[in-house]
Design a protein with these regions (language model features):
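C-terminal ends of transmembrane helices
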Residues: 16-27, 94-106, 148-157, 226-241, ...
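Predominantly late transmembrane helices and immediately cytosolic-facing juxtamembrane segments
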Residues: 230, 344-347, 415-447
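Intrinsic, low-complexity polybasic segments
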Residues: 493-537, 542-544, 552-555
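Central hydrophobic cores of alpha-helical transmembrane segments in multi-pass inner-membrane proteins
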Residues: 7-21, 35-48, 89-101, 119-120, ...
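Helix-coil boundary and interhelical linker segments in multi-pass alpha-helical membrane proteins
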Residues: 1, 78, 124-130, 264-278, ...
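Transmembrane helix-loop-helix hairpins at membrane boundaries of multipass inner-membrane proteins
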Residues: 1-4, 21-114, 191-204, 507, ...
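Alpha-helical multi-pass transmembrane bundles of energy-transducing inner-membrane proteins
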Residues: 25-27, 114-118, 122-211, 296-309, ...
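Juxtamembrane/interfacial segments at transmembrane-helix boundaries in multi-pass membrane proteins
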Residues: 52-74, 174-233, 238, 263-281, ...
């Protein structure tokens, strides 16, 4: 595989198969093999970053192989500025998870790391899939290893939490499958030829408004459950509390981003008119989730549950930024997805460190840990300040962009969402004060050991990334900017189209150009910029036998 994207996708799965052949008693070999495989995958993802060309809005490093050509189904993958950082976040957190589980998983270690590597494969696949059915397969595949991670290696109520997680997510996914079939059916009957599941073909298809409303909610419900967006969040606290530390890290760090990513990749460009109609509804639900999650987090006696409810609040900011539907807010939402993965992943890791030593997560059982665990205290406070959004750390940049962009389109919602920032400072600082400061009142906290080598190696990269994004966010923003501009050009060029079903509307040539990855001017950008023709000339990736490939080619 000369394409680093293909290698990054398939190597974890091949590694999982190889580890499955290791004898069960070779625990040390199993752990070391899993760590090496995850590190090699991360190294390959850095090659993706190196190969990624700035200024090009289209998908890069694409691979397309016909799979079921009669139905226009292909194995097509690629990466753009929206998915690039999420792929890197996935490959970064996987070795962190394996290191954090080095001494904490005491049964079926081989099964645990195999499940983690299969989960990594599925998550990367969902981020890079450019065929809608292929995306759905990866989206569903993620459920199986995460269900096992919670149900086998979780806490006392792990079976209940695993089943609740599975039922919530599969219910939304089945509705999305119905929406996928209906969407492709509409395209098939709009023009003679073979159907197509290619995302680029579906971008170029205008859907009548009555169909858009159903399809919008079919897709949006599946992604809202995954975020999770209030009031569909009730599965998340149980899953986090019962999951092992590694499961919580990967669930909060990556899996929840499938929901916000789905809104950006599918909901907005597929159904722009319905998205505009219901943007305020999703903005209101986001603000309710921001405030509700923060208030409930503030009263939690359990550290892990506190961090879990903080995810409901923080990811509400991401959904708010997405449905503000301008360049500033969407760039902030993408960056905040990465920020949340780093800061909340670090917090779950560090809560797991305490739990392994004291076998309790209750705030009342701690106090004065700054004296007995000084290095751990430094790590935890940095992660907490990052979650709060302290200037100089990553959380500030994402929240600032989201609120700035939202204020332009929905000033009332932006003002209300600002209270979530204040509340997050209150509950995070309250937790820090209860755990780390004051006298050591519990004798069991006197002899508690500071962080071990594997815990230091796991958390330091996350801390470094928090500081890097906070100090130099342009490194990340400049790679996503052209793709965000193109997304908004696609959405805005279709919001005022006649509400009839067509696959090549002459009134909106920007749609076809955007589907073919030709550069376009962002109509909603707060920083409008005309991309040069040379900057974004990427050929559209189209399945064999696609009925729209000639149309798109003629448009180009």
């Amino acid at each position: 595989m000369t394409n680093p994207l293909s290698f990054t996708l398939w190597f974890p799965l091949l590694g999982a198969i190889a580890i499955a052949l290791i004898p069960r008693r070779q625990v040390d070999l199993t752990k070391m093999a899993a760590l090496v495989i995850s590190l090699v995958t991360f190294g390959a993802s850095l090659m993706i970053l190196q190969s990624f060309r700035d200024g090009e809005p289209g998908f890069q490093l694409t691979t397309s192989v016909p799979w079921i050509p009669q139905w226009g189904i292909t194995y097509t993958i690629g990466v753009d500025g929206i998915s690039l950082w999420l792929v890197l976040l996935t490959t970064l957190l996987t070795p962190v998870v394996i290191l954090s589980s080095w001494n904490s998983i005491h049964k079926h270690m081989k099964g645990y790391v195999v499940a983690m590597l299969v989960l990594e494969f599925a998550m990367i696949g969902a981020f890079v899939a450019l065929d809608l059915l292929l995306f759905y397969i990866f989206f569903e595949l993620m459920l199986i290893p995460m269900y096992l991670i919670i149900g086998v290696w979780g806490g006392t109520n792990r079976i209940y939490a695993a089943i609740k997680f599975f039922i919530f997510t599969i219910a939304g996914s089945l509705l999305m499958l119905l929406g996928i079939i209906y969407l492709v059916f509409l395209g098939y009957h709009s023009q003679p030829g073979s159907p197509s599941f290619a995302i680029t073909d579906l971008y170029a298809m205008s859907v009548p408004m009555h169909a858009q409303v159903f399809l919008f909610f079919a897709f949006a419900l599946a992604f809202a459950i995954k975020v999770p967006l209030f009031p569909l969040h009730t599965w998340l606290p149980d899953a986090h509390v019962e999951a092992p530390t590694g499961g919580s890290i990967i669930l909060a760090g990556v899996m929840l981003k499938m929901g916000t990513y789905g809104f950006l990749r599918f909901v907005l460009p597929f159904f722009p008119q319905a998205s505009a109609r219901y943007a305020v509804l999703f903005g209101v639900l986001s603000v309710i989730g921001i405030i509700y999650g923060a208030l409930v987090a503030w009263v939690q006696p359990d550290m892990k549950k506190l961090v879990a409810y903080s995810s409901v609040s923080h990811l509400g900011f991401c959904v708010l930024g997405i449905f503000a539907m301008n360049q500033t807010s969407i760039e902030g939402a993408i960056l905040q997805m990465v920020n949340h993965g780093l800061s909340t992943g670090a917090l779950f890791l560090l809560v797991g460190v305490i739990y392994e030593r004291r076998h309790t997560r209750l705030l009342a059982d701690f106090g004065g840990l700054a004296r007995t665990m000084p290095l751990f205290t430094v790590f935890f406070i940095i992660a907490a300040l990052s979650s709060i959004g302290l200037p100089g750390l990553n959380g500030f940049v994402g929240e600032f962009l989201i609120l700035s962009g939202t204020f332009r389109s929905h000033p009332v919602l932006a003002t209300l969402a600002t209270t979530g920032v204040i509340l997050s400072a209150l509950y995070m600082l309250w937790m820090v004060q209860k755990v780390f400061f004051g006298p050591v009142t519990n004798p069991e906290n006197e002899a508690i050991k500071d962080v071990a080598w594997n815990e230091v190696v796991a958390v330091v990269p996350l801390i470094v990334m928090m500081v890097w994004i906070g100090v130099h966010p342009s490194t990340f923003l400049k790679k996503m900017e052209p793709s965000v501009q193109q997304l908004l050009a696609t959405v805005n060029s279709r919001r005022d189209e006649p509400r009839v079903l067509t696959t090549s509307n002459p009134a909106s040539p920007a749609v076809v150009r955007s589907a073919g990855f030709q550069p376009a001017v962002s109509l909603a950008s707060s920083r409008p910029r005309l991309l040069s023709p040379e900057a974004g000339r990427m050929p559209a990736v189209r399945p064999a036998g696609s009925r729209r490939s000639e149309t798109a080619g003629a448009s180009r």
